[in-house]
């Protein structure tokens, strides 16, 4: 199992990168089955000969689609809790406060959104080492009344009901669940073009470069208020992102039936 090398300390990154290269070289001699959540993540983790072998399986990150019912009333309740008007634009991001999540760019995007629509709010769900840094950026921009730091949230699906559009301008990701969850709920999501195209399951997901916050803000405004809810869960299930399907597939891998 692996996860991204997400650390802004140069020495730690250097050491972890070195260990990754060594581990990647040794994998064919130590492991007999390879499972990746996306093609991009697999290419980072496994040597090419492992991916091309019969022992490699692509098993997408999956969710329990039954939990993702769109509930407008629940969304309004969440907005009322934070004194957010019914007609306001709510932009959301879910993720740890670490360098790879690119929170400074998120703040730049939201500042541009506010120029076009002052009746806008930003939900930031998650916690981490860079939270205080991001809070300082928000305070410096004098938009503290527009940005809500929620910390770790157990009921993310409930909070997402109040969000109009999700953004994920990460520097890199494997296959982010939030992109799947957003589309399952019928919420448009913008993701960076550094993320695997495998997250684009429906027309709700748009990829953008992470060098122009104005472009992101323009895309957000172009989608706000124009999204007619469509239940894409059947399509998402067909594409293999339902947890029931994924569980059965991994059971078969363990039993040697695949």
Positions of predicted regions on the chain:
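Membrane-interface segments of envelope glycosyltransferases acting on lipid-linked substrates or membrane lipids
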Residues: 1-258
């Amino acid at each position: 199992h692996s996860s991204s090398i997400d650390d802004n300390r140069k020495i730690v990154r250097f050491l972890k990168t070195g260990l990754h290269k060594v581990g990647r070289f040794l994998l064919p001699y130590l492991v007999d089955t390879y499972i990746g959540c996306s093609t991009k993540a697999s290419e980072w983790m496994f040597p090419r000969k492992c991916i091309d072998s019969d022992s490699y399986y692509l098993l997408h990150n999956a969710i329990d689609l039954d939990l993702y019912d769109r509930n407008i009333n629940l969304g309004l309740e969440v907005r009322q809790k934070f004194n957010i008007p019914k007609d306001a634009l709510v932009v959301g991001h879910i993720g740890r406060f670490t360098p790879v999540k690119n929170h400074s760019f998120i703040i730049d995007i939201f500042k541009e959104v506010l120029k076009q629509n002052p009746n806008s709010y930003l939900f930031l769900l998650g916690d981490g080492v860079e939270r205080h840094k991001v809070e300082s950026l928000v305070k410096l921009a004098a938009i503290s009344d527009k940005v809500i730091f929620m910390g770790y949230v157990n009921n993310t699906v409930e909070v997402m009901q109040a969000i109009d559009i999700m953004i994920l301008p990460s520097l890199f990701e494997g296959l982010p669940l939030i992109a799947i969850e957003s589309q399952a709920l019928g919420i448009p999501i913008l993701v960076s073009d550094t993320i695997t195209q495998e997250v684009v399951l429906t027309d709700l997901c748009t990829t953008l470069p992470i060098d122009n916050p104005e472009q992101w803000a323009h895309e957000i405004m172009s989608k706000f208020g124009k999204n007619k809810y469509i239940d894409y869960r059947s399509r998402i299930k067909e594409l293999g992102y339902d947890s029931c399907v994924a569980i059965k597939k991994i059971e078969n891998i363990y039993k040697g039936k695949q």
